[in-house]
C-alpha cells in the first residue's frame, strides 16, 4: 500500500490531516466570475482542491419535450432535463 503522496507540496498519508476537496457543482450559476469567487472563498476556508464537473447540456441529454425528458416532482418539477443542464453547465471554455 502507498504510504504517502504529495500534491502541490501537501503530504497525504495515514498520519496527515485530511486533504479536503470541495464540490462546486452548478453553484456558479453560469458566471465564471462567481466560479472564481467560489474558488477563492473555498481556499480561504482551507479547502485543498475544487472538483468541477465540466459539461454542456448537449453532452448530457437531448433537447426533447417528451415525458421521459421532463422532471417530475421536487425542486425541478416540470423542468425539461435539457433546460436544467443548460442552466447548470460548466462550459469547456472555462478551462
Region locations from a protein language model:
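Conserved, mostly hydrophobic/aromatic
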Residues: 23, 42
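Aromatic/hydrophobic pocket-lining residues that form the small-molecule binding cavity
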Residues: 35, 91, 95
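Glycine-rich, proline-tolerant flexible connector loops at the mouths of alpha/beta enzymes
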Residues: 48-89
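N-terminal amphipathic alpha-helix/helix-capping segment at the start of soluble metabolic enzymes
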Residues: 1-21, 95
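Glycine-rich phosphate/pyrophosphate-binding beta-alpha loops
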Residues: 25-27
Amino acid at each position: 500500500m502507498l504510504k504517502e503522496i504529495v500534491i502541490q507540496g501537501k503530504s497525504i498519508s495515514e498520519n496527515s490531516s485530511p486533504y479536503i476537496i470541495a464540490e462546486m457543482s452548478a453553484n456558479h450559476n453560469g458566471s465564471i466570475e462567481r466560479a472564481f469567487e467560489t474558488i477563492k472563498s473555498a481556499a480561504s476556508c482551507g479547502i485543498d482542491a475544487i472538483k468541477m464537473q465540466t459539461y454542456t447540456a448537449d453532452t448530457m441529454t437531448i433537447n426533447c419535450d417528451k415525458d421521459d425528458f421532463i422532471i417530475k416532482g421536487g425542486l425541478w418539477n416540470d423542468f425539461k432535463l435539457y433546460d436544467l443542464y443548460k442552466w447548470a453547465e460548466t462550459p469547456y471554455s472555462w478551462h
